[in-house]
Amino acid sequence: MTGFQFNTVSDLRVGAGTAQQLGVLCQQLGIAKPLIVTDPGLVQVGLLDPVRDSVAGGCDEVSVFSDVTADPSESVVEAALHALMTASADGVIGLGGGSSMDVAKVIAVLATGQQSLPDLYGVDQVTSERLPLVLIPTTAGTGSEVTPVAVITTGATTKAGISSTRLLPDVAVLDPQLTLGLPSHVSAMTGIDAMVHAIEAFTSKIKKNPISDTLAKRALHLLAGHQRRVLSHPNDMAAREAMLLGATLAGQAFANAPVAAVHALAYPLGGHYHMPHGLSNALMLPAVLRFNAPVCEALYLDLATLLPQPVGPGVEGFVVWFEQLIADAGLPQSLSDAKVPEQIGRAHV
């Protein structure tokens, strides 16, 4: 066996009600004045209030930055950093989907004043220490709570990544109560995103290893086995917890055995057409699976055994299973369905 390295979060708290322990958790981390980073949608649906109340039970003062947008820009990061500095916060709590958690990661590093945002772009460019960091996902998709990566929008159609183990949080809190009632289209897109993470980690040509393989397979089993249930019964706590855990396991897998062609093709769609990341992944997945089939057949057939039956024969049966899931979820099944123009300029490719 070839040697490998595996990094992940050292402290995971999983289960219904775990977010009610945030005050105690902050005390354990030495956080007295945290900043909660989230988005307006979570404020509107009332998810912020119980989290803030829980945090307040163990802290002197709690501040909130709730202006995170999808595909957060550099200006959003700078605004969040300003809020942190104004509040003299000594810790950061990211609450939400990947966008909120990514912003939380970045400002926890920038808060020390040792580096500017452009200094961080790239791989292993973070040299600064960071503030204590807690991440709490409210969707079962990105796995950002356990990945050493943040993605920031740098222009009208461009993004830049930051990859460093210093972005891994001190603690990730997985509370399925915070995902109950998530809109079905969001559950569908984020769930498929997480499944793509698992598939691409398992079939990755780079850094694939026994730990990432084990996590990816367990992740796909959980995600594929509960995706339809959360769409038909959005308040099923057990199904929500399975999806949340599956997304986290997939995140741990692809954080160490990186994603590939599906994501490479999906990123430009998000950048140029502002398409949700989970949807762009769903659109690219079937074509990439078929393209890779000649060299990934054995791996795909292994993964096919983890899917709920019925699954048709061979690799084509594996691909069709995902096509049917995407269709049943009511998501667009082609670029034209998603309003992407047939003629795409060379600059967009």
Protein language model features and the residues they cover:
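Gly/Pro-rich interdomain helix-loop hinge
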Residues: 269-343
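Short glycine/serine/threonine-rich phosphate/pyrophosphate-binding segments
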Residues: 19-22, 44-47, 74-75, 99-106, ...
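Glycine/threonine-rich beta-strand-loop-alpha-helix active-site module
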Residues: 75-176
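Conserved small/polar residues in nucleotide/adenosyl-binding loops
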Residues: 347-349
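Glycine-rich phosphate/pyrophosphate-binding beta-alpha loops
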Residues: 141, 248-281
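Carboxylate- and glycine-rich phosphate/diphosphate-binding segment that chelates Mg2+/Mn2+
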Residues: 149-257
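ATP/NTP phosphate-donor binding region
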Residues: 1-91, 316, 335-336
